[in-house]
Structures are given as structure tokens and as C-alpha cells.
Amino acid sequence: MAQTMLLTANAKVDLRSKESLVERLKPKPLSSLFLPSLPLRFSSSSTNASSSKFTSTTVALFKSKAKAPPKKVAPPKEKQKVEDGIFGTSGGIGFTKQNELFVGRVAMIGFAASLLGEAITGKGILAQLNLETGIPIYEAEPLLLFFILFNLLGAIGALGDRGKFVDDPTPPTGLEKAVIPPGKSFKSALGLSEGGPLFGFTKANELFVGRLAQLGIAFSIIGEIITGKGALAQLNFETGVPINEIEPLLLFNIAFFFFAAINPGTGKFITDEEED
């Protein structure tokens, strides 16, 4: 009897040891690596108690990629307008430098013609047009006053001076200037462009001379309205003489204004649209 009980006890121990060995050899789930291990044998009461106390934590294996911050786009820079004058684009009534150049050329021709006419006839520009002179300025013809004001404002660039003149590329100098290129005329050896003007004025110089002519014709008219004398008589030049007896300096000035008016200057005129 005692031997039977001993064998039974040994069998129970062997069974338990075998059972524990089988459980050890069983593959463990992946969650056991991250979650705390629980006892295999537990009662229902202990299960309820432990489940109420146990809280699982979620572990992220892969993190979401952080979004890159949006790139800041710099606002486009406002392009400056092409301005090259006294009042700038904001001033005046919309004249461009090309318009001013045209008005200046007309003023040069008019001023030169008035000087030549006064030198030959002895009459000022207003007397040649049979306009009343030798009166106060406020009694002058309104159209004549407008003409004076227009020339004065044009001479200082107040009519609008949008745009600018750009010079042509610099011609070669030194030995390159002295050598005549193949197929070119003798004009190239003198430093003059093949198809350009003979006179060495740029359009910016031409505009300056035109403004001087506008000032000259405006002040000569103002002086003649008040004094009754023409521009040459106010400067004590001899007038009413043949053309061959006119003062050489006066003839040079007349020829200069005529030639500057008809000879196109070098360079080109650019505006805001051409800059874009």
C-alpha cells in the first residue's frame, strides 16, 4: 500500500514536470516581449482583480514622418520705373523724353529762324508776326502767354520726363580706331559710325540744347513784349543788315541751332515697357 502511494506521488510530480517542460517549449507570442508576463494558472477571482489593476501600454514601432514646414516665398520686388529727369515719372502731363526731344528740335529751328529774321529785317519775332509789343506782360495775348509758359515748363522738364536715353556702345580707340576695317569706308577711320550721324551729339546732348533753345525763345518773347525790342536789339547787336554783314558769332549760333535740330543724335530712347 505504501509503495502504491509513493508511485502515485512520483507520477504526479512527473506529470507536473512534464507539463511545465511543455509550456516552456511552447513559442511565446510577440506581445510577451512588451507586456508583463502573467501567471499561467490563476483563479477566476484573481483574474478579475488583476485585469482591473492591469493596464496595457501601446508602443509604436514606426513613427510618422514629420511634415516639413512650408517654404516662405519672398514677395516679388517692385521694379523701379525708368526715370531720368527733374520731376520723375510722377510729374508732368505724360511727356516722354522722345516728345521733349521733338519739342526741343522745333524750338531750335524756331529760335534760329527768329534770330536770322531779326538780323536781316531788324524786327523781333513778335514784330515779324505783327503782334503788339511794348506793353505790360498781363496785357499780352493769352495764346502768346500760353506759348511762353509751355516753353518754360518744357525747358525744366515739368511736362513729364519719363524714360531715358542710352548711349550706343563705345567705339574702338587707339590702334583699332586708326585701322580701317575691311569693306568699310574712310568714315570709319575718322571714328564715325558707318551709318550714324556726322555730328558727335548724343540724344541726351540734343535734349539739353533743345531746352536751351526753349528758354531762349521764351525769354526773348517776354523781353520783346515788355520792351518792344527783339532778342538781338536787347543785346545791342546790329540788325537790319545783309546776311554777309552779320556778326560771325551770331552766324555760328544760328548755324549751330539749325544743324543740331536736323542732325539725329546717337543713342536710343528706352521706356518702362522696353526695360521689361
UniProtKB/Swiss-Prot annotation:
GO biological process, one term: photosynthesis
Keywords: Chloroplast, Membrane, Photosynthesis, Photosystem II, Plastid, Repeat, Thylakoid, Transit peptide, Transmembrane, Transmembrane helix
Boundaries of the annotated transit peptide in chain numbering: 1-67
Transmembrane segments: 106-126, 140-160, 207-227, 242-262
GO CC terms, sorted: chloroplast thylakoid membrane; photosystem II
Subcellular location as annotated: Plastid, Chloroplast thylakoid membrane
Keyword Metal-binding appears in the UniProt entry: no
Role, per record: Seems to be involved in non-photochemical quenching, a process maintains the balance between dissipation and utilization of light energy to minimize generation of oxidizing molecules, thereby protecting the plant against photo-oxidative damage.
Protein name: Photosystem II 22 kDa protein, chloroplastic
Gene giving rise to this polypeptide: PSBS
